[in-house]
Amino acid sequence: MSKLSILKQKNKRDVDMTQGSIFRHLITFAFPLLIGNIFQQLYNTVDTWVVGNYVSNEAFSAVGTVGPVINMLIGIFLGLSSGAGVVISQYYGAKRYDKVRDTVHTSIVMTLILAVLFTIIGIAMIPFVLNFMKTPAEVMPESSAYLTIYFAGVIGLMLYNMGAGILRAVGDSKRPFYFLVVSAVLNIILDLVFVLSLGMGVEGVAYATIISQGVSAMLTMITLFRTDSCIKVELKYLKLDKEMLAKIVRVGIPAAIQMAITAFSNVFVQSYVNYFGADCMSGWTAYSKIDQLLFLPMQSLALASTTFVGQNLGIDQVVRAKKGARTAFIMSVVATVILTIPLLIFAPQLVSFFNGKAEVVAYGSMLLRYCSPFYVFCCVNQVYSGVLRGAGNSRAPMIIMLSSFVVFRQIYLFIMANFISNTIIPIALGYPAGWLVCSTLTLLYYRHADLSKSRLVEDAEKRAEASGKSRIKAV
């Protein structure tokens, strides 16, 4: 047997969440995620800041307009990678390391196939998508250029997210954080070089983004190839395992649809916002960037709860999984309330950081002050959707979000725009209205859900592990 085929079950960076302090596991897992996501938002924010201050208002609007499209793309693949992460975390918790290995290699092959498809289909769909969003003619060329470059380099985004999801599934959120920091710093440097020094405009920002994402993907893949644990990637195992692919799809497809639905609903909202012109679009872009920062704590804790619940249900510790869910929810509420207060007080100053034009600041600060008090409701659907996904049930969150963010929100927007008040504030309040409906439905479902029923690890496999039949040996 080759040296590389005899793998350690655990690496020192892996974390077993099936025992020990729940709060400590959640905070130590979520904190690197939070800081990493802040860095990711930082370089997205720098993109926007550079364009808004050193290119043109039209370029600023162009970058803002493509935001929902980019987020929809990211959402689709985050959903698929979360499917792989849930399968890995449950088998890791159940100590079925052979199944972990099979899932890891299936996930990588799936990612490479999807990257090719996303690139081809994405570039072909750009004109249709921008026209569907009612993108103004003056920003159409720059929006199209940005999206074309982004889709051409999407493989970096996809490989990083899948690789990071694999690492997080076994409790390692630190190394994905380190790679994001490197990517963020590189992106900022390239932004300044391409836009300020070389005058490449929106295209320079897009190139900076895909290059930095490519570097983070490379670092993640090198880590997976060089690790000595059960998530090690080896060329000879790179194939699609039908059983593992079916389980990834079972969790990942509904999760991908759920995340795409959220982003797609934003495409609808963006089309309503575009109606009010470039200043409103710019104000909305600034508001959206700040909005994304506020969501980071609850999103990080939602990811932490997914891994925590996955590992604990893998070994059938349902009570501990539910305690983790409750703890993550309380933590997210506290963090969100603390962050909301400065937004209400310093809204104009925050918006002016992105664009100092008076009309843009007025729109952006108004949107912040109307919407930010409702962010606390998002903690419910963010955390408990993460819990349900960790349990292997991503279908229920998908249906709930479809009902709330597509059906309800689009009916609300249509009625507001056509029959009640065709102004920006009633349109913007479609967000809090959707959050409230989604959170109510999610909480009602969770209170009556049996988490153990959606567990992906079969009892037979658990018995096999107890009998010592795992194919991968410990060193």
Where is each model-derived feature located?
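Helix-terminus/linker motif at the lipid-water interface of multi-pass membrane proteins
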Residues: 38, 42-60, 130-137, 193-200, ...
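Short runs within selected transmembrane alpha-helices of multi-pass transporters and secretion channels
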Residues: 81, 150-168, 176-184, 205-220, ...
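Small-residue hotspots at the loop-to-helix junctions and early N-terminal turns
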Residues: 55-68, 144-147, 206, 278-293, ...
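Transmembrane alpha-helix boundary and packing residues in multipass membrane permease domains
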Residues: 33, 37, 49, 86, ...
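Transmembrane helical elements of multi-pass membrane transporters/channels
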Residues: 28-47, 149, 160, 183, ...
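Short alpha-helical transmembrane segments in multi-pass integral membrane proteins
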Residues: 1-30, 88-155, 197-253, 309-374, ...
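Residue-level signal for short hydrophobic patches within transmembrane helices
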Residues: 19, 23-42, 46, 69-76, ...
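Small-residue-rich hydrophobic transmembrane alpha-helices
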Residues: 60-120, 157-176, 270, 283-347, ...
